[in-house]
Every structure is written in structure tokens, then in C-alpha cells.
């Protein structure tokens, strides 16, 4: 199935939703000194930076903004590169896009007996950052100063922006057999045959989008 490539090959297409970072009026660019890293972390940092550069997700930056980076160990022992955007988040105007209420989600599922969940791996990288806001995503490392062209993890409005995109994509099927919660899609049906049909529709949409 070509719906789920092992890795995203490069920049996503232009979409009706772009990720914007509106900051409080009068905010000056914030730059934070890079954190210390162990030798093993530095090797991993160099490798992950190169991968992000090769895919076009980041580019070298001259921005006056700059967040530090750190690693978080995942369950499988591998290291996830995280940008510490806490200072930027403090001055970002919050997006009020509503996340769904959990009790509303359960109401939709009450007659369903068959479920599938799709976790959109690296889903945030499907959304481009608005060009004028790219410099605000900048981060500093021992190996240089970079900025994101796609929406990175850790920004305060990222979940709402991705939710907005997913709801637009699946608008026709919400409250029928699809629940979207940030980067998870739940498909629910009353019967297995109905579920197979619902899955085909969702996978086709994902392939096209």
C-alpha cells in the first residue's frame, strides 16, 4: 500500500492551511544559548540534522530567533530530536481552534463495533510554515543555526493547526464514521463489511492528500 511511505520524501504540497506564528505586538526576537550534549548525542544530532536537510524540512538560518535543542529517549531506545520552543510559546498568540470534547467523541462511537486507528506518523511535517514566519522556528546547535520550512513539534499552536487541516480533509465523513483527534484518525463502523468500505474511503483520501 503506497498510502504510508516509510519516510516522507520531501516537502509537502501547498495546502489551504499554512502554519502561522503570530507573536504579541512589540515582541523582540528571542535567542537561547544551546544546551550541552554528550558525545553520543552530538553524533545523533549531526545525523538527524543531515536527514532533515536532505528532505528539505530545514534550511540554514540567519534568523535573530534561536531555540535550543535536546534529545528525548523514545520507548524503543532511539533518540527524538526536540526543539525547546518554550520561550517562543510564551509570546505566541494562542490559536483558539477547538479540540473535540472526549464525551462528544464517545457519543459518536456508541453503536460501533469495529474500529481502526491510524497514527499519522510525522503528520506535522505535512504542513508548511508561512514563509514570513519561518525565521521564528529557528534553532541553534553546535553544528549551525537552522529553521523549519514545515511545522515542527513543540510549538503551542501546532496541534490546533494540524487538527484544522485534518478536519478540512475529512469534513464529509466527520460524525459519520471518522473521528479526528490531532494526528490520530479513528474509523468506526457497525459491521466488518461496512468497516472495510470506510477504510477504503479514508485510505483513498490520505493517498490523494
Regions found by a protein language model. Give the residues of each.
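Retroelement reverse transcriptase polymerase core
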Residues: 1-209
Amino acid at each position: 500500500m503506497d498510502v504510508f511511505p516509510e519516510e516522507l520524501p520531501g516537502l509537502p504540497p501547498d495546502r489551504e492551511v499554512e502554519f502561522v506564528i503570530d507573536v504579541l505586538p512589540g515582541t523582540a526576537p528571542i535567542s537561547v544559548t544551546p544546551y550541552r550534549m554528550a558525545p553520543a548525542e552530538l553524533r545523533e544530532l549531526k545525523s538527524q540534522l543531515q536527514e532533515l536537510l536532505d528532505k528539505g524540512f530545514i534550511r540554514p538560518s540567519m534568523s535573530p530567533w534561536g531555540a535550543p535543542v535536546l534529545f528525548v529517549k523514545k520507548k524503543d531506545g532511539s533518540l527524538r530530536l526536540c526543539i525547546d520552543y518554550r520561550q517562543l510559546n510564551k509570546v505566541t498568540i494562542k490559536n483558539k481552534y477547538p479540540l473535540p470534547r472526549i464525551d462528544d467523541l464517545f457519543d459518536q462511537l456508541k453503536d460501533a463495533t469495529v474500529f481502526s486507528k491510524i497514527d499519522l506518523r510525522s503528520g506535522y511535517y505535512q504542513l508548511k510554515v508561512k514563509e514570513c514566519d519561518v525565521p521564528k522556528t529557528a534553532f541553534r546547535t553546535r553544528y549551525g543555526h537552522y529553521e523549519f520550512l514545515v511545522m515542527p513539534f513543540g510549538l503551542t499552536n501546532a496541534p490546533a493547526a494540524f487538527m484544522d487541516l485534518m478536519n478540512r480533509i475529512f469534513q464529509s465523513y466527520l460524525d459519520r464514521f471518522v473521528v479526528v483527534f490531532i494526528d490520530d484518525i479513528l474509523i468506526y463502523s457497525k459491521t466488518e463489511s461496512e468497516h472495510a468500505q470506510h477504510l477504503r474511503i479514508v485510505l483513498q483520501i490520505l493517498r490523494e492528500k
